[in-house]
Every structure is written in C-alpha cells, then in structure tokens.
Amino acid sequence: MWGQNAGFKDCKKLKKVVFPNHADLGILPNFALGCTALSKIEIDNWQYKMQDGVLYYYNTNSWAAQYYCEGYTATRWNVAEYCTAINCEESLKNNAHIHQLRLNSYVSCPAGYKLPESLQAIYVAEDNKQYFSKDGVLYYGPNTNNPNRLFCYPADKPAVTYTIPENAVFDMGSVKNKHLKTLVIPKSATVYDSTLKYICRGTVFPNLETIKVQKGSPHVDYIRTTFTGKVIVY
C-alpha cells in the first residue's frame, strides 16, 4: 500500500488518518497536503512511528521526519534525537501553529523559504556542528564551508531590534520579517550586497525604521546614501 505525495489534497475537514496494522506500507513525504485540520495519524508498523505530530520513517539504516501534521497545534517542534533528516518540508511549511524549531545534534535544517511563516525562533543542540543560533536566528557553524553565514532569520520573529553577531555574514535570501524596526550592524559583520540593497529598500524588513552601523564598517556610505530611514553611525 502506497501513500503517494499529495494523495490526500486540500481535505480541509480531515482530522485523522488510520493506516492498516502491519501492512506493507510505503508512505511518501507529504502524502497529505492542504489538510490543515489533520492532527493525528494512527499507525502500527515497524518502519513508521508517530511522535508529537510527526510521522517518522525508518529506511533500515536511519530515521527521517516524513510528515508533519498540518493541523497539529503544538507551538514547538523538538526534532527527535534519532532523526537524521527532515523530508516533510511542504507539510511543515503548511502548519500555521509552530513558533519554535529545535534541531538535534546532526539533522540539517530545511531552507528558510521552506519553513513556516509562523516561525519565530530556531534553536540547535549544543553539540550541533552545522549551525549555531543567536537569539533564535540560525547561522552556519564557524567550522563549516559557510562559516558564520546567516541560514535563516525566522519570518515571524517578534523582535523589533536585532544585532548581527560579530564576524557574521548576513544574507537574508527570500525570507521577509515585518516586525524588525532597528538593525544593528557591527563593523566586523559582512552584509551581502544584494541583501543590503533589499534591507535599504525595505524589501526584507518592510517596517525597518533605523539602521545602526558601527564606524569602520564598509557598508556605512551605502547605507547613508540609500536608506531613507534613520541612520546612526556609532
């Protein structure tokens, strides 16, 4: 028996899916999409398990998060310690309740544009070598191929002021945040040209009012001549 991608689609009243016990199952990632009331899956199969609204799949070598119930109302997802991959990107993005995501020691995070718009913070286990989190904002780890580079600024992070970490590389990508009003840029931080342009034009932070940039930063002149809000050189 196969659960194909989007086998259940836009079933707005669907609340529970029950799979036959001990059946020969193949449940593909995101088998139910647009099912925003689905909060429970019943399954008794050695290759699958449910934990905290997430269906995990065992491929005989490792466990992966295969489906995130779109109607599961918990505001925090702690990725199971045994999970090595997140395959449920579409169903996760469709969940409007999750505010916090905590990555375990070794799992990779979906790209920022694939994360829920309701997300306010991302945290990581202390021994995770891929990433570090600064005030709920996710960066690549210092010993990776993209050291200290921004991975994701959560779309619904409620902070009105954010200070980029020292020596960080700030690259927003396509994620937008409407809450930020003041951005602080230390001179040791690098802001990608494209990101700086979008910041100054109000594309990524549409309600940004003030940029505080440290004296000695290579971005001072561009910010002064481009940003129409308040510029403070400190």
Where are these regions (language model features)?
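Structural signature of tandem-repeat unit edges
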Residues: M1, K9-G26, C35-G53, Y68-A85, ...
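Short, solvent-exposed loop/turn segments that connect beta-strands within catalytic domains
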Residues: T60-A64, N143-N148, T203-V204
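Extracellular disulfide-stabilized recognition modules
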Residues: L55-Y67, L138-Y139
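Alpha-helical elements of the RecA-like P-loop NTPase motor core of helicases
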Residues: A111, S194, D221
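Periodic small-residue-enriched repeat registers in elongated scaffold domains
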Residues: N5-F8, F31-A32, S91-L92, S174, ...
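Short internal loop-to-helix segment that lines adenine-nucleotide cofactor pockets
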Residues: N87-C88, M172
